[in-house]
């Protein structure tokens, strides 16, 4: 039952510890620098019983339980306290992200601007929108007559209509107080009402008392209403929390007054200094009055005197029912000014101004124009107020303010009226049909604004003498008021902050011209703000606002995370008053309330009782570490439901809309990417979706979707279906957003668990663990225990049956779950009675410290382990948890990695050569994964050699296998239903070449029938990785000339001459399937990249995970080895160097062989021989081989630890392990043949040893007397698992150090390896069948996120474009995201471009049904974007925003002329020349869904910025993305073969008309016209139905040749009318095959 030979002298644990010690120290130093300040107080605040209970029931360790207890004892665990703590903890995490403070500051500023704009635009376009079941002021018809009010409330009324920061739109004190009730409705309508309440108070609570608003109906009852309202207020019960909220509300009023007085007008900039003086004077006066009010209210609360409250209201000026101007000035003017003469003067001025405004309004004939000018941010119900009342209110505002300010305050009043300029609405607003109408309306509003301003200015100037007297008297009275002098200093310290906040956040500060010409800031995902996007630098207000955000975010970063702070504290007042925090508070409070309700039900608590700490810790453990089933069940319980047993679509949509509105989650890639309706439809749909993307996306702005009532239930074809909990949990397997609660559980993890994990990692070896464990297994029905050595490393749990042997078990830990099994649990080993108890069972049962823990995988399979030491069990549990994380940006398995060198390869010629160079210098292992692999494909066709066969893939792999390199190939096992790619023959061919060192796995064995492995991966030594769209197969090789003929078989020999539009390649035939003389080949355009560093390790992890899963899924591969990752290289430090002072560049270590001309080296691999170089030699090292002979046929036996070529002209061996500088003079032989390619990128990539490659050269010696340095250990231990060299290498390292001290010659120190400048994140599409894990569709989420965040342009090259916009199939919404982004650009009048480069049509015969269907659906995806835009903007020119193009080439072949499309197979997304996505994923459901084809891509952001231009303005572009796009355009425009420096410089600016129209579109149109004229219906894009298509070539004539010579480059237009008259074919064949290609 159990056989095990214990080790005699050494174990693996000290080996691993010694190897990783330096690396762990470096990692700990980096972590401590980037972690939030976490200093637990370590106070015993819990009982041992609580600890024991939580340790047994939760997923936390004892240390984590203690720290969580420590936190929760410092916060209030009520609804408000827990909500505030979540918000603070979230911000604390985000500010510690690199550039987090900058990104958050820009995000908060931009959201303030955008949010107010969207809200008010939506109000204006939905004036009649009311919720029937809402209890907010939106639902009550407001027929109130606006009356003149006090100075403070009049200003605040205007403020709330303008700023909408903290205050609601009502102005009387009783409404403000009534808005602060703590009763949360559990009704489902609550979320629909939140939209209405968002700006009514900070805590966003329902307004239950609207009676006071109705008291304002009659203007003739002003004085009576004043007394009545004061008596109503005095009868209210005030709480301390309400007073605090009121204080905040009053502060926001103060802020909004500052905002109005600080709004700039371009016509009066020469008075700016004078304005600032009076701005601060006015602010100081208002602060005094509001401070007095707040202090007196607090005094009222303490004294509980109703009479005092009335006095407060009267003194504070909060009552809004004062009718005449005498009551307006009661709190600020002395009794001497409250005379009849003063009242008469004010009334006369008011009537005069009102008449002037009315005349101007009637003259213009545009009532809405005046509304927009005076009350741009008016509440919807207030907008319905008659014009006369609005005019009266405006008149009251100006008149009242004029009597309380100095002589020059007319400038501030002027700005008050014109500050609310109409700004063009954002996406989703449908009132403006086209941009022409929008411009006309804007011009008319500007004219009205100017006239109104002039009238107001004249009126104020005429009354300025009296105003001066009034202000002077007011100041004297304030100085004589002792109460105000004692209480007016509370808010003065923050006056500057408040002023700059509202000056910058007010949307009116941005003029129409500057705002519409430039997009929103791209800081929050690009980093630095691009000032060049505007014609002038950012305003002072914006700079001050962002700086204030930065300062307070810096305070959060420096504070102790466990200090119990919240944003309610004064030091965070600026952040707390932002619109984003108000929105977060409301949403999180809603979720926390749902959570508390669930806890009360689960633990049978009283209705109003708050959960205990134990309850919260237990639930948080499920949220963050629970199983898939547990998390999904918790999500089901958190939804507010009508029935406990089922959840309806509208109920789930309600919660998702709220979480989706957490902008910070989406910006940082943590949220649920995609519209809420799309997510819900994916969960509830039966088969294909019945709701198209237009229907399931509301017309209102997306960021407001949470606050609006869901429109889905009112849409046609909507069916409010339901799911039971069992079915809901079942569907969570195929929807990764459900177990995450659509991002909310990620938020909880970031707030509470990640800080603890980081804190513990800084003091505990958390990432690795090793030791002996017993694991349970069953032999039939008999349970047995097996003792194995296990180690946790790089995301895998590895078990060894014997030490120093190959692993017997490898478990991928990605998104697994581990938990300690308490002794009381029925599955604990003490509770299980075994029929047969052997010695091992007795040994386990007899140990009191024996601890059980269970590991659960994504499919709920479990594996139980038993450790005889509780400490060791805890280490394993912690290490497993650390290695099982997967919720990184875009929900990817990999986190973004810094300092990566990325090399792009355009077309197959450069890519194949780069792969050949890397394979040639492989030293330990090679991983290859592909959709199709051809063993005979040639990798280097430009080199001159007498034996060109040595460049074939099979020859290269055969050579490396004979040298001892392990080669693992993972290939798609295609089904005959789909196609025949000859994978069976490939497997047989490769394994016959070298059975020991080449292993090939075909996957999947049987099911699924339709899905494929579409990843294209090459990994060499786990150090350099190649990914992209190119397979190592026939038909992929091409260069910058895109030849359509090759009669002499120079570039495309044999079967490599392919045209898959005529005949698809079958198997791996060596014969050509098309006639070279009469049929053209189809050129192939593709893009791939190479990566190094930790990004290459992430690609390695992906391959190893897939390999091990494929091995386990088929018993035929039981004997194949498991793969594991190599020990991680500390890439953050320079490569180690031997003592350089003893070495000379031209001196060899081996004195006996200076020329190293030995042709044969016999290398003994016996474990007892200490003179063997096992680390760097190219020997065949296997588990059962003792003597290996390697023959070298040339003089340079150099091997590179970085897979790079070395000096081929040097006969002497370079034996130093130093990093050698790259010598370009030695690369002449490798760069002789480049086909006169003038492209810098191509020249740089033909040889991987150039300066742009991933690393510099290192060389070592393969000699039987030469030994390696111990410093090379970390860089040479491979991941091969049946090589026993790991302990042997480590055992020999100390004995071999002295070999590097020969030849005492001085050598100056050499520079370390150069780091890259790119940040790279690997994203992919995998699921259970393809990788043995939960569904991951991070590629799709990244595409959507980057399209939504684009600012200037989107450039896409892809093989397919099958997406959803306006129809039900397919399900992905890439096209819809593009449509929404163009719609936003139209509404903002932005210059924005979207360019799609697609093939003319997909591979396959044009007469085939599936090819016709793909053409149809591609055209539907494109025309869907255009159709929906034209519906909304009938007069828009879509060509200004969208360009669809293809590539085509021609050539003369004898007496005929060939032409064929250049097949665009690349999968590239470039956004704003800042960020790029490159990989294997097409734009269709197969690639993006995650549950279908397996895909892999890389998101690349380069921190190295270069000077560029956008729309003619200076711009900083990322070097990688910018150079890649420019190189691609040079290829497409023919600038490679015909260089034009001027044209190459112009294409740097894609956005400007002179490039987009005059170069790109003009060249495409001209080339398309020539092709149409010459070739006619012989090319498919000129045919509207298949009967018109006449495949073939044309005869060569001088006229045709002369016309074709007018074609420049290869660019043509994509014709959406191709086969437009052909009906959509339907057949059984199309239903099966085509659905596989399109949707499945």
UniProtKB/Swiss-Prot annotation:
Residues 122-247, 264-283, 439-499, 521-541, 1149-1315 are annotated as: Disordered. Residues 1297-1306 have a biased composition (Basic residues). GO terms for molecular function: phospholipase D activity. It catalyses: a 1,2-diacyl-sn-glycero-3-phosphocholine + H2O = a 1,2-diacyl-sn-glycero-3-phosphate + choline + H(+). Residues 197-231, 521-534 have a biased composition (Acidic residues). Residues 1009-1036, 1460-1487 form the PLD phosphodiesterase domain. Its EC number is 3.1.4.4. Residues 133-193, 264-273, 467-499, 1149-1274, 1282-1296 have a biased composition (Low complexity). It comes from the Eukaryota. Keywords: Hydrolase, Lipid degradation, Lipid metabolism, Repeat. The active site is at residues 1014, 1016, 1021, 1465, 1467, 1472. It is an enzyme of class 3 (hydrolase). InterPro entries: PLD-like_dom (IPR025202), PLipase_D/transphosphatidylase (IPR001736), PLipase_D_fam (IPR015679). Residues 122-132, 232-247 have a biased composition (Polar residues). Disulfide bonds: none annotated. One of its GO terms (biological process) is phospholipid catabolic process. PROSITE patterns: PLD (PS50035). SMART domains: PLDc. The keyword Metal-binding does not apply. It holds the Pfam family PLDc. Signal peptide: none annotated. Inhibited by butan-1-ol. Plays a role in cell growth. Hydrolyzes membrane phospholipids, such as PtdCho (phosphatidylcholine), producing the free headgroup and PtdOH (phosphatidic acid; signaling molecule on its own). Involved in the inhibition of actin-based motility and endocytosis. Its inhibition causes complete collapse of F-actin organization. Belongs to the phospholipase D family. This is Phospholipase D C. The lineage of its organism: Eukaryota, Amoebozoa, Evosea, Eumycetozoa, Dictyostelia.
